[in-house]
A protein has these predicted regions:
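Cleavable N-terminal signal peptides
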Residues: 11-12, 22
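Amphipathic, charged alpha-helical segments and their helix-to-coil junctions
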Residues: 24-174
């Protein structure tokens, strides 16, 4: 044969590696800071205001309940020695029930806050994700890394494009 088997293998490998090298040179990567983008979105500001208002209302309700419990507890402690045993036991049971309702209210308030957060923020994050995908497709990048969510200790700006401004533009944010 004109070519030896070893030379043929080297030639085949070079032909396989050459396109990979050319392909690797065309890879484009991007990165963003999602927190910078989200915090500039009007939808985020509105959602945060609603969450703060709900948190304030729940906090006031809890405080009112705690003050009522504290008042009844102090009254009970002042009167317990002068109350008949049956009445003292009934009031103590009422206090225990109040305490249990308070704990249930606190747990429910926490669940309500989490649900409200999810409900209000889901559309914000969907809008952000849609904008990221649109910019990624328009820029022809393979990946867009979120520097706010993924701790990447080093980004070579010559190899990775900062797409934060373009995502903001896509969202109509300055």
């Amino acid at each position: 044969p004109l070519y030896s088997s070893a030379a043929s293998d080297v030639y085949k490998r070079q032909m396989l590696i050459l396109p990979m090298g050319v392909f690797a040179q065309n890879l484009k990567f991007g990165h963003i800071n999602a927190m910078e983008i989200v915090s500039a979105m009007p939808e985020y500001t509105k959602a945060q205001s609603e969450l703060q208002a709900l948190n304030k209302q729940l906090g006031q309700d809890l405080q009112r309940s705690q003050e009522e419990f504290s008042k009844k507890y102090q009254e009970f402690m002042q009167q317990k020695d002068s109350l008949p045993a049956v009445i003292a036991e009934r009031r103590q049971k009422e206090l225990e029930d109040m305490m249990q309702r308070q704990e249930q209210f606190q747990a429910k308030a926490q669940q309500d806050m989490e649900k409200a957060n999810n409900d209000l923020m889901a559309p914000v994050y969907k809008k952000l994700d849609d904008a990221i995908k649109a910019v990624g497709a328009a820029e022809g990048v393979i990946y867009i890394f979120d520097m706010a969510r993924t701790p990447i200790p080093y980004v070579n700006e010559a190899q990775s494009i900062n797409l934060t401004p373009k995502v903001k533009t896509q969202l109509g944010i300055k």
